[in-house]
């Protein structure tokens, strides 16, 4: 399968173990100085704050600007803390420098999925897929 299909499959695999949600937004350029500000804007505009447990995570990538950010809702952020997200961004940036884009996304999806699983395990009686698993492409 292609890289896009592999990334979407990784999101689905991660979400099968947790009530948490993972989304990816990719665009060419970041119009903000800090990519985290852009990720936050997208998080809210995509209504990712509406998950039941406030455990959605947005992985943001601006390809041409070589910028990445991860924005997480308060439910998961309070569990794992700022250092976790910083380490994930550093790992993604390292892969991106070597043009290993799919590997970067697959690794962060796996790590975030594991954190979501630990703190928000899947419950077949109450959990449903609250957000689409597709990759969102901006301009």
Functional labels for PLM-detected ranges:
Residues 1-17, 22-124, 128-130, 134-138:
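Divalent-cation
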């Amino acid at each position: 399968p292609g890289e896009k299909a592999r990334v979407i499959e990784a999101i689905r695999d991660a979400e099968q173990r947790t009530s948490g949600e993972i989304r990816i937004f990719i665009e060419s350029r970041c119009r903000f100085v800090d990519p985290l500000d852009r990720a936050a804007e997208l998080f809210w505009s995509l209504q990712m704050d509406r998950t039941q447990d406030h455990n959605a995570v947005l992985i943001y990538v601006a390809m041409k600007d070589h910028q990445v950010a991860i924005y997480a809702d308060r439910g998961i952020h309070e569990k794992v803390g700022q250092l976790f997200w910083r380490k994930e961004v550093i790992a993604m940036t390292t892969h991106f420098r070597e043009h290993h884009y799919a590997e970067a996304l697959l690794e962060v999806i796996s790590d975030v999925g594991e954190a979501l699983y630990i703190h928000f395990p899947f419950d077949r009686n109450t959990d449903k897929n609250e957000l689409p698993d597709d990759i969102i492409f901006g301009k």
